[in-house]
Amino acid sequence: MPDIVNRKVEHVEIAAFENVDGLSSSTFLNDVILVHQGFPGISFSEINTKTKFFRKEISVPVMVTGMTGGRNELGRINKIIAEVAEKFGIPMGVGSQRVAIEKAEARESFAIVRKVAPTIPIIANLGMPQLVKGYGLKEFQDAIQMIEADAIAVHLNPAQEVFQPEGEPEYQIYALEKLRDISKELSVPIIVKESGNGISMETAKLLYSYGIKNFDTSGQGGTNWIAIEMIRDIRRGNWKAESAKNFLDWGVPTAASIMEVRYSVPDSFLVGSGGIRSGLDAAKAIALGADIAGMALPVLKSAIEGKESLEQFFRKIIFELKAAMMLTGSKDVDALKKTSIVILGKLKEWAEYRGINLSIYEKVRKRE
């Protein structure tokens, strides 16, 4: 178990201080153009960014996706993020709680989140491979109760597990059967999220057939977990490092993943994440088909610098989001979902090759 705790710390250290953001991959968000409206028909002061996150109202259609926890120093980061998220009315996810379920002294680094953020939605987190390894309803309930969570994320990370020195790439189909049965017993919704390589329409349809309707794309183009594990392989002299280099651009780009999930599961609740680095990125993700946008790495980096740095980061994100809403004439989040967009370049090629009819998609993304 100390290995898991140390791994959590090493992951944060590499993510924050090594070059693992984007690299040779792309979100394809540059191929999404929000159409400028020279006369928006609204004033900046009347723009309303409030929306719903399941049963709770949130101030902005942006969430902090799960990152860390497990040791005191990681708990301090979680505390800063939670305090600032509470101040801005932004949902927050925690990192995988496996370490806290199996190691009692790690629990406080997660529990602190709800203590300092009593009102915002908090999202618990466990990994899909743990279902194969024996986790069940008891562990899910423990993770939820630990932080009084409003939802629980189940993360998919096969690419990370394949290249991780101590990885457990266990994804047998009966994990989904267990997840379906567990979901019927839980009092909070399950969100299935990827970990930097995106959700395809095949995966979305498969998950939907097992009762999953909530997704977090975590697409290619943001934090590169294959690169993080490659660095860990290099540090250990592990031969997997050479192979990992060939997979640094692996995955479904964020914009493509948003389209694939929305097109294949139109009634889903969808978090668009993976390389969201600005309020404009968030606006594009929502206009393209996400319900809210999610981000992790820039939040982590700002939190490491301190509370004031993170507050300034969120102010910047919210301003940029509102600027995009103003310039598209979108007075609220529902209007942003229906705003005019143009899809160009590689994203258009991807969509057409994958059988996404753009005329039909235009109606699907607007929820018509």
UniProtKB/Swiss-Prot annotation:
Localization per record: Cytoplasm
Residues the record lists as binding FMN: T65, G66, M67, T68, S96, N125, K193, S218, T223, G275, I276, R277, A296, L297
Residues annotated to bind substrate: R7, K8, S96, Q97, R98, Q160
Effect annotated for changing R235E: This mutant is heat stable and its affinity binding for IPP is smaller than that of the wild-type. It is in the tetrameric state even at a concentration where the wild-type enzyme dominantly formed an octamer
Keywords: Cytoplasm, Flavoprotein, FMN, Isomerase, Isoprene biosynthesis, Magnesium, Metal-binding, NADP
InterPro entries: Aldolase_TIM, FMN-dep_DH, IPdP_isomerase
Role, per record: Involved in the biosynthesis of isoprenoids. Catalyzes the 1,3-allylic rearrangement of the homoallylic substrate isopentenyl (IPP) to its allylic isomer, dimethylallyl diphosphate (DMAPP).
NCBIfam families assigned to the protein according to its UniProt record, in alphabetical order: IPP_isom_2 (TIGR02151)
Protein name: Isopentenyl-diphosphate delta-isomerase
Annotated source species: Saccharolobus shibatae (strain ATCC 51178 / DSM 5389 / JCM 8931 / NBRC 15437 / B12) (Sulfolobus shibatae)
